[in-house]
A protein has these predicted regions:
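Active-site-proximal alpha-helical scaffolds that flank and shape metal-associated catalytic sites
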Residues: 12-18, 80-168
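Terminal targeting/low-complexity segments that flank the catalytic cores of oxidoreductases
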Residues: 1-77, 121-124, 137-145, 157-168
Length: 168
């Protein structure tokens, strides 16, 4: 049963959709080692390599499939704006740099070689598996399912999920 709460958010049986998504993302963060283990130098390097690849693939290919299938112009424009921040330039949070460029700078700052270590990185099997799963959600299902998959993936980057350093 759909209702509306005091803030005007759509709700499902008294819980806002956003609250439910937040709970799912939090539960994922609590059961996934990445969100509560120490950030070792090796994990930091792997994060730079894989997240840089993921930022480019998900935002230049996969999210655009959702935007293409979305019939709502305003939502489509918000998806494209988010992709632009990730791939071209983020004036709001990145000082005009794309998110993949920020990750390259982070890698260099922790001692990684830009060409040989960061740009030459290949996706891990787990990264490829995630891309295949997202491809299925964003290409072969209703556009809302792709939007929800994108939303959950992005919300995990917002401080407040999991515990320890990743929560901050």
């Amino acid at each position: 049963m759909n209702e509306t709460n005091d803030e005007g958010d759509r709700t499902l049986a008294g819980n806002s959709v956003t609250q439910r998504l937040d709970q799912e993302v939090h539960d994922f963060a609590m059961r996934t080692r990445f969100f509560h283990e120490d950030m070792t130098p090796g994990r930091a390097r792997t994060f730079v390599r894989q997240h840089r690849l993921n930022t480019r693939q998900r935002n230049s290919v996969l999210k655009l499939r959702v935007a293409t299938n979305c019939p709502d112009w305003d939502i489509r424009m918000r998806i494209l704006d988010a992709c632009t921040q990730e791939v071209i330039a983020d004036e709001e949070h990145g000082g005009g740099r794309a998110h993949w460029q920020i990750l390259e700078q982070l890698g260099v700052a922790i001692g990684m070689d830009l060409e040989g270590d960061i740009r030459a990185a290949k996706p891990l099997a787990s990264t490829q598996m995630c891309w295949h799963a997202w491809d299925g959600l964003m290409s072969n299902t209703h556009w809302l399912e792709g939007l929800i998959a994108n939303t959950c993936a992005e919300r995990a980057n917002i401080p407040g999920y999991g515990q320890g350093v990743m929560r901050e």
